[in-house]
Amino acid sequence: MAAGAGAGGGGGEGDSNGGGTSPGGVSAAAPAIGPHHLGVAAAEEAMWQMTLGGGESMESTPYPERIGEPDCSYYMRTGLCRFGMTCKFNHPPNRKLAVAAARMNGEYPYRVGQPECQYYLKTGTCKFGATCKFHHPREKAALANRVQLNVLGYPMRPNEKECAYYLRTGQCKFASTCKFHHPQPSNTMVAVRNSMYSPGQSATSPGQHTYPGAVTNWTLSRSASFIASPRWPGHSGYAQVIVPQGLVQVPGWNPYAAQMGSSSPDDQQRTPVTTQYYGSRQSETGGMGDHGMYQSYQGGSVPVGVYTVQGENIFPERPDQPECQFYMKTGDCKFGAVCKFHHPKERLVPAPNCALNSLGLPLRPGEPVCTFYSRYGICKFGPNCKFDHPMGTLMYGSATSPRGDVSSMHYQLSPSPGHPGILLDGGSGRSHRVPQSDSQQIPSGDGNAEREAS
């Protein structure tokens, strides 16, 4: 009996040591694992995983909850605090709920002794909410909401730097929350902005803007205010929408009128004669037939020599800096008021050595057609462009002009220095030069009448 007990005891000791053998070397069977052992192991594993995960609902970290004290910013961001129970700030049990409540109520942490949140002082808001580590004085935030807005809805802060993006593009994605200064738009920008509106409409009031055409009315829906940027003016003389068939007639428009001024006061008083512009269709009452042709300008309508920017100059004048070469060539500058070079109001531009069409663009029959002009009807290089700008390129989608009538596509030129006549192309591949005295009397009929006049 004692031996049996000893054997049993040896078996128990061996089992406890994990060997499973008796001291005598006789192998003993391991005891079976019951279902209760599996349940205990699973529960321990689940508790271990929850401890590692640090679940929000099972937090038992020793962080003090101090009602009335500012929230611990590090704890609110990460859920941890290295100071533990010695931290003097508040640690709410459910920090996610506390952050959401602070954002909904518009409450921001009041941390006396910390630097003031500059973004909160200027805009009255803070994107970090309750997690911001700076001080948010509520009495100063009320003054931030009283900032004056310009006509476009952007804040004017005279004591701050000017918004560089706003000066270049006329827009600001931060809107009223931008911390920089947004001055009132210049007269030139407002004038260009209002150039496409009728006298009875306002450029700043949203709504429907109808442009009467010769065939149909084109209504443009506008849901936001636009400003003419120095490079690509919005709602300006440049048509930004391709209009099918029902084309638009804009009286008294020249795409280069605001950019180029005549050097002679007498030339400024001369006006074009019954001019049809890009995107317009010839009226049935006109004397040019149904071909949608362009009447030539009177003498002196195309400026040469000294080009001046009319109205207020939106580009900076820096006499002690080199001249902006791009501005001297095109009259435009994509950097706007932040450009570091000199932009003189009067710039000497060499007179083009070719004839110009009624839009002020050069006609170079031997050169390739300007790709940008053929697509959009404009050219930023103006009379200095080295490519050809034929008027026939603009005459697309004409339902009244037969396809085979090629003779109706001809150049209409305005006289320029060194070119006493007007070059006509009757569609036969030959060019004819007409004296200036006879060019004003050329009837706009078929190609035969033009050849007889030459």
Curated annotation (Swiss-Prot):
Q: Where is the composition biased (Gly residues)?
A: 1-23
Listed InterPro entries:
Plant_ZF_CCCH, Znf_CCCH, Znf_CCCH_sf
**From start to end residue, where is composition biased (Polar residues)?**
434-443
Tell me the domain of life.
Eukaryota
Zinc finger C3H1-type: from-to: 66-94, 111-139, 157-185, 318-346, 364-392
Region (Disordered) location: 1-30, 405-454
Please give one Gene Ontology molecular function term for this protein.
Answer: mRNA binding
Q: Which UniProt keywords apply?
A: DNA-binding, Metal-binding, Repeat, Zinc, Zinc-finger
Protein name, UniProt field: Zinc finger CCCH domain-containing protein 66
